[in-house]
Amino acid sequence: MSELTLGSLFDGSGGFPLAGIQAGIRPVWASEIEPFPILVTTRRLPQLTHVGDVTTVNGADVDAVDVITFGSPCQDLSVAGKQAGLAGERSGLFFHAVRIIDQMRKATHGMFPRYAIWENVPGAFSSHKGSDFATVLTTPVSYTHLTLPTILRSCRSRWSPYH
């Protein structure tokens, strides 16, 4: 099996790329807009290409990767915030990640990415009485032609907040 590759959206200080390296996955690119986290990853992960703001990234124009990770902003989903949910300005950036994944899948005829990993706060499960999490599950399906049972099975067995 060939080496897995990773692209990280909403990268922050490179948590997903660092975890990828520990798991034998090669980070290729990252999208982040905050200057200090970019400085951190530029120094710690010099092999990582910074592709800019997630709102302007086109998934067809970046290197195709096996895994796309994204921890879209949590402020609007958190129980500590105003709970605007996915309709909020920051947490709504989730939809840009799905767009980028869809663009890459179309450009690679469905070959890449093979995996998409979304991380967020526990409030994402209860935001708007669970309807935001239902949107998180169904939106990628409508874009990428995955099957909902596969996503739900993965969610139950691996990504439960109670695991």
Predicted feature locations:
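Conserved Class I S-adenosyl-L-methionine
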Residues: 133-143
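Hydrophobic alpha-helical segments, chiefly the membrane-spanning helices
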Residues: 155-163
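Core alpha/beta nucleotide-donor-binding catalytic domains of modification enzymes
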Residues: 2-113, 118-133
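Conserved small/polar residues in nucleotide/adenosyl-binding loops
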Residues: 144-150
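Amphipathic alpha-helical oligomerization segments
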Residues: 105, 151-154
